[in-house]
Amino acid sequence: MDNAAIASQSNTPPSNGRSSARFVTPISVHSSPISAEVIEPSSPFSPPSPSTLLTSLSKSPSHKISNLQMDGAKTTCLEVIQNSSLVVDSPKRQDKSITGSKAKPASTMRHGQRTASHKMATQTEIQTVDGDRLIVSPKTRKKKAATAKRTRKQDGVAERRLHGHVSKVKSPGDLKLDAKIPPSKPCDNKAPSVGDNTDNELERQTGGLQLEKATKRRLDWTPTKEGPIPMVDLAEVHSSSCGKSVIRTHSAGTLLSNYGFSGVVNTSLAPMPETCDNGPTTKRLMELQNFYSASGIQTPTESRPATNDSQSISSKQQRVKVKKPQKAKLTTLTSYVTAKYSVVDQTADLDRIETVNSGKNKKMGVTKRTSGTERANAARGKSDTLKNGNGPPVFKVVPPLEAFKSFDGQELLFGTSSQLEHGHSEDQDEEIQHTADSINKSNVVPRPAVSKGLGSSLFRLSSSKNLWSASSRDLTGAVLQVDEIDLSERSIEVSTPAAKYKRKTGIRDLSGQNVIDVEKDTRTLAANIDTRELDNMNEPSLAEDDLVYRENLESTNAKLNSQTPANISEAMLERPPPDKPIFGGFTTSELAKQVAAYGFKPIKSRDKMISLLEKCWENQSKSSKLEPKPNQRNHKSQGDDLAERQLLGLKPRSDSISFVITRSPKKRLAKTSVKSQEPKSFSLSNEGPRITSKLPMKRFVSPCAILIDDDQSSDSVGEALPLSPSHSSNGNGTLHHPQDCDEIHAPTTQMAIRSAKSSISVSSTTNLPSLSSQITKAVQSQPRIRAFKGLKQPTWYEKILMYDPIQLEDLAAWLNTGGFGLIGEDREVGAGVVREWCESKGICCVWKKQASAKSH
């Protein structure tokens, strides 16, 4: 440029005793303050490297001539200092060149002036211009006092508080130059003199660090939004290979600010915030605020975009899926037990959309929908209410006092699972009567009683408190009380005559077997049956039979006990009277069946059932003891009893297992002969007579079966089965069948058929307590045993409390030797009775013989 000119090489000798280089390049400075010295690369030597030039500038603050070595050649660059006095000097010095001899005095004088007046000092900037020249231009400075203090404090703060990577933001032109650095071209051997480098460093660091933004970034520690790239003070300088190298090496001194950052990385990361702002996020995809406002949910008639329609359809499908598990069947015991608590859980799991917007949506739907939709909704509402009515009842929370009172009245059942499983529910009789009535109405073969009473049993199970009744299932997995239909003797239903006689029946024998299978006789009777007469007969309902039977049980038993023939009564008189049955040793299911045999409703309490059975047994034994037992009765008295039975409402019937043989009023049956098997036993006829009556809905046996049921659990031996007077009236063993003579029925249970230990007593001598209660008293009254050699000897009661396995033989031996003696009991018990007692109390018991056999 035209502001400065570079003089030619001069051979001026050194002055003032200082030796300099052979070639000195004079620099002429323009007199105006805007002018700048221009250094042209006219020197034949190679230019100095940027690192060497930076070292010379930083190590010579006293304005001395620095020696620069480049490519083995020594060149001396004169350091020029432009002060305010020099810039504002007269135009005489405009074209004068500064030689090496005059450099030192001038520099010394100007240095003194600069130190004396800081306000007049200016800083020199090295700027790059397109071409191969360096421009040293002066720049007026601001007030140094305030600036110095501020920059030093900020510098200290930056070193003490900033821990991140901070770099100077460069202009796009500088970034391109930085990315592509051309090889350095030869520069002039004389470098410009720069003054006040320390102040320049502080000002550049202050402008490049950007402490305010860095502090904000440190506090937030989040990427800053994209903004205008700030320009650095050095951005005005144009590209030059030599000048560019000077700038880069000069900025290398501030490694703390440039550490970890580069211009290329900044350019690549610049467009990233734009993509993050415009791109979708997970929170924006959810958009939950539309569902919580009533205005966001529109009715089907309103126009809405397809996206909202799809979202509403998907939400409706989700609501329907939530409601489906509520309608699932109770297929497990756990689900049945927790059914009453599931109401609270379902309300907690409902969708919040339904709870918040249920009332508003209903109002909007009613106002905006047509009449046809309103009718459909009304029908849906009714169906929903009906469905909800069939659901589990709402359980109310009672006060604590009432809850404790209910606990006091609650009865606890102890025993094994098999014992509790056979318990009867409260609705047993009602179910049996309902099933029997439905079968009696039709003579066609109906479906089994299991499927007939399925709905009622399921409905009753919802309110039943017996958990064991819920364990019974049918083939479809539905809950069913199978025990009440299959195991209960009073619930046997047969609809057709052929099906009735296909049942296997058994009866007690007076011989040693106690059980006789009469399946063969039933087949012959079914073959000879007259179906026409069976259709003409009218049967009363099962409920009437039960009602009349319960009212006239004792009177009927008294009449039936008087029908014992001579041979049977004499045989019974020779035998010892049986003991009182041990009702305490029965299981809960056996006690319930005994109570049902007497005609009472099921009772939950075990103690009440035992006391009731004992009273019934005592009353029956007293009546049988007081009433006379004639050897025979005339047919007229028997006919009178039957007439009374018919007047009371009971239908006279006959059974294949009954010993009261009847004849048809229209046909006369052939007489059958009876072959005696033993002198003291009763014999069956080989030729079965034809019976014209129909099998009853429940099994009924002869009067003797009542005594079997009463004493079926006693261990004593002795039985009495009275026969009809026709057996003893003829000595040859022929049976007489009077006309219009029907039999009298008394119910029995399944225990009467399968039990082989039962005995029948005509009279009872003494009323003794049950062995079960006596065993309990003996075990509890055992005194404590002293320790033997420091080892405690627990009693039987303590062993039971500690859940130790009780050996049946040892406990029976102790009871017979000393246990019953503590309470004044003279009877003895065996291991079987002890086992029944243990099972009734839920005590763990083992057989001693089995343990010894396994050990060997």
From Swiss-Prot:
Residue stretches of biased makeup (Polar residues): 1-19, 296-309, 673-686
InterPro entries: Slx4_ascomycetes (IPR027784), Structure-sp_endonuc_su_Slx4 (IPR018574)
Gene Ontology biological process terms from the UniProt entry: DNA recombination; DNA repair; DNA replication
Post-translational modification: Phosphorylated in response to DNA damage.
Primary localization class, coarse: nucleus
Keyword DNA repair in annotation: yes
Superkingdom in the source lineage: Eukaryota
Matching CDD domains: SAP_SLX4
Region annotated Disordered, chain positions: 1-24, 38-65, 88-121, 139-202, 296-326, 362-392, 621-640, 668-689, 715-742
Sequence ranges of Basic residues compositional bias: 139-152
The entry's keywords: DNA damage, DNA recombination, DNA repair, Nucleus, Phosphoprotein
Database matches in Pfam families: Slx4
A cellular-component GO term for this protein: Slx1-Slx4 complex
GO molecular function, one term: 5'-flap endonuclease activity
Biased composition annotated in UniProt, kind: Low complexity: 51-60
UniProt xrefs under HAMAP family: Endonuc_su_Slx4
Function as written in the Swiss-Prot or TrEMBL entry: Regulatory subunit of the SLX1-SLX4 structure-specific endonuclease that resolves DNA secondary structures generated during DNA repair and recombination. Has endonuclease activity towards branched DNA substrates, introducing single-strand cuts in duplex DNA close to junctions with ss-DNA.
Protein name: Structure-specific endonuclease subunit SLX4
